[in-house]
Structure formats: structure tokens, C-alpha cells
Amino acid sequence: MGEALSNLEIARGAKLLPIEEVGRSMGLREERHLEPYGRHVAKVDLCAIEDLSERPKAKYILVSAITPTPLGEGKTTTTVGLGQAFSHIGKRATIAIRQASMGPAFGIKGGAAGGGYSQVVPMERLNLHLTGDLHAVTEAHNMLAAMIDNHLYHGNGLGIEPHSISWRRVMDVNDRSLRNIVIGLGARTDGVPRQSGFDITAASEVMAILALASSLEDLRERLGRIVIGHDREGNPVSAEDVRGAGAMAVILKEAIKPNLMQTLEGTPALVHAGPFGNIATGNSSVVADLIGIRTADYLITEAGFGADMGAERFFNIKCRISGLEPDAAVVVATVRALKAHSGRYQIKAGAPLPEELLEENPQDVLAGAENLKKQIENIKLHGVPAVVAINAFPTDHPSEHKAIEEAAKEVGARCAVCRHFTEGGKGAVELARALEETIEENERERRRGGGGSFRFLYPLEMPLKQKIETIAREVYGAEGVEYDAEALRALEGFERAGFGRLPVCLAKTHLSLSSDPALKGAPRGWKLSVREVRASVGAGFIYPICGQMRTMPGLSAHPAAERIDLDGEGNVVGLF
């Protein structure tokens, strides 16, 4: 038996359709809607939203997961595999995923195109530059930073308090040495010295805005609302105040258009925006979904990390803006992650899996399945039916899959074993059929007066503090919330400033339902600790900080960048 092909080798061996043909399969017109970037990538003009508005809406499916290990559990791969699977049962699907950040691609996480025989291609285009959207976000963000420092240098007419400036600079590289810096050093003509730093581009509020804007006009308005600090009287100062928002909108004029690609089996893939999953929504763009919802029988999108993180924000932030209501959600689970949630194993990024983790042990799977059950409940809290996708690995045992099925059944969820990594769409047909049946069953129940109807977890009128406590209690399973004094002052200030009607995006670890990454399973009897609260007013949410959040990653001892190169024919090698 030969050595297994790498993701890059599989992707490179694919026969791709011309991007115009992919667009036509969605009902997009080449001359009006598509702006090709080479043979296999195109931008989609936003006029498609209006042009397609009379077409039937697709069924809207979210792909989420259990609380992941540092290795990830395969949401993107499942999203791609599921999209391909629908064509095997005579249905059309479009998928919508986030755009990759180059920092993690050269770090330890690798790319974001899926894997095996369920990938978006060309995968090296997706993982490296694509159409330059991340560079546009970087440029727009840093343009505002330059405008702020220029305003300080030329007299500071707005009376900005330099120590209050929260707008740092960004770049799409993992570089820990830039987390904290001093700028403006040198001669008097070199600027006003102050402490600042760099974040990774995915953590920029501009990226969050790109993901949530529903039109070019909405993008411009949101950019103007960005709060960069406050003046000497404590009043917020915006990007509009420093006259930077217009230039930012110009830089992002093309970036707001979603990118069209395809999967290995020719399923259309809208790839757009990549906000951080910790301090932002972790979802792909609203405009991609507004286009995709009119192009197929099913639109499948994903949300970052576990259902407590990306899915909760998808429901309560993204869906409020888009006006779209999901018909079902997938919860991706793996045997290895559920064993880890038993608390008996430790999985570390970049390290080999513990030998004992690969041994047959359905009891440990059942012990860790408390996390799965809680994440299914988190989906159902919003009136959305859930289906569990067991992302199967060759080291799994049938008894372990049966344990997952039993746990899912306890909380009323169907379950499907998926092998889309090795089999492509054929390997996720069971999941596609389970979703089709679940959606039809829910619609029948609804017509009879039962069944689930989509609902938000909280109304926008609810005070910020109460919103935080509702999410902590209902979604995370906390018994209460503890606030640092600084966090309470910030909440009071945001309410006074008129930001109290914004939704809340809790920034916490993705490795636990709690704010402590070491607590596995579905912990009880703990309290969420909120140490500070920040506002992304332009993006349109408040984000409390729970625990330590890194917004500029560092490289590992042996990052992927060490293995990435060009071969003698100019082809990329080592990307995964």
C-alpha cells in the first residue's frame, strides 16, 4: 500500500472547472456578477444579492462542533464534504467558509481549505493571498492608525487622550516580538512617542466589520463608528472624527465582494472574511450568505470553535444582521476529542497523540460525551435541530462510534458516521440524508404547531450585564459571573454612551466550555470571570474578556514555515 497523499498533492491532482462554469451552476451571470482572478477564482459583485432575490431560498445549515482539542475536529472538512455529499443524492449545495489567515498557515495550525478529498481548491491560492482581501484589511486598519498618530502630531485638535488609544496596528504574520512596542521614537518630527503594539489581521475590528457588513454603504457606516479612544473629557473618539473612515472604505471597496472557488468535486464555495473566533464572531461574511442562500437547495456555512463560541455568535450576532434563519445545525465530534473530554488524556498541538488515546475505550468516550450533549443543547436553545457528524478516523473503533450515537440519542439528535476526508462527498451521504430528514421532520412538526422555531437567546433591550450572565448560564453552564471593578466601570460607561443595545461576544478560551482551558467535559459549579470589557462599536458588539486572550500569535519551535518552499518547477511544497 502506497504512502497517503498530502492535502496539497490531492488538491494539485484535481481537475478544476472554469470558474465561470461554477458561477453558472449557481445562476450567476459571467458578464454581470463575476470578476475573474485567473481561471479558478472570481469575485462576486454584490449586485447579485438583489438580482437573485426572487429565487427560492436554500435550506440554511450551520456546521459547528463540540469543544475542540488544539488539533481541531474537522469543521471545514465536514462543511466541504457535506456540500459535496448533497450532489450524490441529487441536490445542489453551495458552501460558505472563512478566508484563511497566512499567519496560522505558516505556524502550527496549517491551512483552512479542508482536508483529504474534501477541500476547497486551488488550496494554495486560498491559504496564500487569494484575492488580497486580508492585505486590504491590513492596509485599511493601518491607514486609520496612521491617521490617529498624524492627528496627535499636528496639534491634537480633538483633544485625544494618548493613553486611551486602543487602535493598534496589524499584520498577517505570527510575530510575538511585536505584541508590545513603543512608537514615535527618534527626532521630534518622527511622531508622538507612546506605547502600542501589533495584532494579527484576523483580530482587527476591520475584519469583523467586513464579515458583518450587509452592503458597501453599511461597510462605510460601520467603519465610521469605530471607537479608537476617548478625549480628555472621556467622550468616545471615532474613525469618523479623525477623518479616516472614507479612505478605509475606498481601500476595502473590492474586498467586500465574496470570493468564488470550488471544492474537489465542483461544489461552489464562497470564501470570504476571516474574523478571529475568540474576540469576534468567527463566521464568514453576511454578504456571502445573502448571495449563497439563493443559489442552491442547501447553503452550508461553518462557525469557529465549538457551539458555545461560533454558533452562539452566529445565531445572536450574524443572523440578527443578515435576517436569515438556520434550518439545522451539524455538531462535529471526534472520538479522540471526546476521550480528551473525559479528563484522562492530554492533547497538545504539535505533539504526537498519547498511545493510550488510540486504544478501544467506549467508556471514556461516554464520559467525555457530556460535552457533546451540552453543545447539542446549545444549538437547541435557539430552536434549531441538531445532527451529530462523527468525523471518523482510521484509529476509531465501532464501539466508540456506538457510544457517541447513544449519547446523541439521549438528547434527541440524529447521528451520522462521516468519512469524507478519505471518500469525499460519498463519505458524507449519510450525514446529508440525516439533515434532509431532520429538516423535513422539523417543518412537519412546525406545521402541526410543534417543532422548533429559530429564536435569539436574548433581546437587544436587555442590559449588557444581563446579556453576559444569560450566555454564561445558559450556554457555558456557569453558576454565576464575577466582574473585576474595571469591567463593571466599562459596562456602566458603555450603557451611558448608548452602546447598551449591542449584542455581546464573550472572548474566552475555545478549549473549554468554561474560561479555564484545563476544565474539560461539561463542568459545573464554576463562575465566569470577566476581567475587562471592550467595545467593537463599528462591528456592532461588546466583547467582555474572560481570561488571557492573545491577539498576536507566536511561532512554535518548528513552525510550518520551515517546511514550506518552492520546488524546481515553481510549485509550492510543504503546505498542509
Curated annotation (Swiss-Prot):
PROSITE patterns xrefs: FTHFS_1, FTHFS_2
The enzyme's E.C. designation: 6.3.4.3
EC class of the enzyme, as a word: ligase
Residues bound to ATP: 69-76
Pfam families: FTHFS
Pathway: One-carbon metabolism; tetrahydrofolate interconversion
UniProt entry keywords in alphabetical sequence: ATP-binding, Ligase, Nucleotide-binding, One-carbon metabolism
GO terms classed as biological process: tetrahydrofolate interconversion
Gene Ontology MF, one: ATP binding
Reaction(s) catalysed (UniProt annotation): (6S)-5,6,7,8-tetrahydrofolate + formate + ATP = (6R)-10-formyltetrahydrofolate + ADP + phosphate
ATP-binding is among the record's keywords: yes
Top-level taxon of origin: Bacteria
Family that this chain belongs to: Belongs to the formate--tetrahydrofolate ligase family.
NCBIfam families xrefs: PRK13505.1
Stated name of the protein: Formate--tetrahydrofolate ligase 2
Origin organism lineage: Bacteria, Bacillati, Actinomycetota, Rubrobacteria, Rubrobacterales
